[in-house]
Amino acid sequence: MNDPLWKKGEYFKDNERPERGLSVARMIAHITYLSEDAMHRKFGRKLQSRDIISFGFDADFQVESYLRYQGQSFVDRFDANSYLYLTRAMDYFDNYEQFKKNIEFSHTPNEHLKYLIISFTSDWLFPSQESKIIVNQLN
């Protein structure tokens, strides 16, 4: 929303898309898709196409190159306003709160239900700790 081309979501009038802001937003969000351990295993501090650090603003590290690619490829196929609405919906979603509202209903007498709770240790949006809380409540 700080991209000057966003224009409070009215960017279609001038046919100029807020690509910089959308690209940076995607790069930041993409970091949350991998845990710190996963990022370290995948990239560490490996250099991208060079033997020494340039101390410039080009992508010295593989992780920089990867995130820039993710950001740029995203603006080619996604709309900034759509991304804002999707990320806002994710902000408001609370898996555990939804679970608590439904747990009493799902534990009616004589009901034989099986549950499968799957989590990924690399998931920052829905951490494994939250899944463990749900499993404990189901037991």
Where do the protein language model's features map onto the residues?
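Acidic catalytic loop of the alpha/beta-hydrolase fold
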Residues: 73, 121-126
